[in-house]
């Protein structure tokens, strides 16, 4: 709100060849002056896609952690489903103090795995019995049908300060995950402790219950989604989760999906002993008729507005629209890009003229 600009910047590392790589986070003041720059990357480690600023001035970033296929196999990955390049990329989250250049908290998917392939491994167990863990043998294939090293490809991150929880989106597994942020370094690697008593295990997941053997392909509700977020307090639908539900090979159209997570009073999530996490159906969807007229197979974003409408960023083609709860379009804009750059938008946000950050630039 003070007029600063905060976000990622490109410091590419050629050994991570996947969409969304950045390797740098920056903050600029209202006059365009660089306040700080943090580079996050190396031969086997790189920040990518998204960041979120915390109230304490630190930020959360998504990072890749690259290991060999052999190491993934040691963790229970099926040798028949490793990428041809001989690598396996775990996703993680770090909290960084940009002034001390220090990682003050971290989490990695590599510590929260289950598999039912090799009974000798420590993480062997029934996948359906452990919805709080990630089956290392869930697989993603790219548009050419190849299994990729970029396993989960987290593409967005959000933080809920009231619940002290982190929300991330895995389009490769067609799921959103929520984890506890109030854990010690040991607790974040384990299965106990923290505010919710589950350490760094998943508190909640939604979108594709087949990933934890509590559903089938017919139960899938997210398809390559982007920009998962909690609707902020004070806005219509506050506390719900909103996401751009892209679609793809399984579904050649997009929707905007809003869900009401099954939240207990203490901030934990309801789940039946043998069923998938709810809800069974979205609380609201924007799904134009015919559906094929609204489709972006990659990037894209969404934002709930104070008037109850929703700003939709159709990333492929760079089309913005504001839609009502009834699906009526009340405003549209087509971004033309610059020069020969293809027309695409990763994300867009709308700010009112009296937003404090804008007033900082005009007064």
What is each of the regions a protein language model found here?
Residues 1-363:
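Histidine-/acidic-rich catalytic cores in large beta-rich domains
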């Amino acid at each position: 709100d003070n007029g600063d600009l905060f976000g990622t910047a490109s410091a590419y590392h050629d050994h991570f060849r996947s969409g969304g790589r950045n390797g740098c986070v920056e903050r600029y003041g209202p006059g365009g002056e660089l306040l700080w720059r943090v580079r996050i990357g190396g031969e086997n480690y790189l920040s990518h896609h998204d960041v979120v600023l915390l109230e304490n001035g630190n930020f959360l970033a998504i990072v890749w952690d690259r290991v060999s296929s052999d190491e993934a196999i040691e963790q229970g990955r099926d040798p028949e489903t490793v990428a041809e390049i001989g690598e396996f990329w775990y996703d993680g989250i770090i909290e960084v103090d940009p002034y001390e250049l220090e990682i003050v908290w971290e989490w990695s998917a590599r510590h929260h795995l289950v598999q039912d392939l090799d009974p000798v491994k420590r993480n062997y167990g029934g996948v359906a019995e452990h919805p709080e863990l990630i089956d290392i043998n869930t697989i993603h294939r790219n548009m050419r049908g190849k299994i990729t090293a970029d396993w989960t490809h987290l593409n967005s991150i959000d933080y809920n300060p009231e619940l002290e929880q982190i929300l991330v989106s895995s389009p490769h597994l067609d799921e959103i995950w929520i984890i506890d942020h109030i854990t010690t370094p040991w607790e974040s690697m384990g299965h106990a402790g923290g505010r919710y008593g589950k350490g760094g295990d998943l508190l909640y997941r939604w979108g594709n219950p087949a990933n934890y053997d509590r559903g089938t392909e017919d139960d899938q509700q997210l398809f390559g989604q982007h920009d998962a977020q909690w609707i902020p307090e004070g806005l219509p639908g506050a506390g719900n989760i909103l996401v751009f539900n892209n679609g793809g090979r399984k579904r050649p159209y997009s929707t905007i999906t809003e869900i009401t997570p099954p939240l207990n009073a203490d901030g934990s999530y309801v789940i039946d002993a043998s069923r998938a996490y709810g809800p069974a159906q979205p609380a609201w969807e924007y799904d134009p008729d015919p559906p094929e007229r609204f489709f972006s197979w990659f990037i894209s974003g969404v934002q709930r507005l104070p008037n109850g409408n929703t700003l939709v960023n159709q990333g492929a083609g760079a089309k913005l629209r504001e839609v009502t709860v009834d699906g009526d379009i009340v405003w549209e804009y087509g971004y033309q890009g610059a020069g020969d750059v293809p027309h695409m938008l990763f994300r867009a946000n709308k700010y009112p003229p009296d937003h404090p950050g804008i007033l900082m630039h005009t007064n």
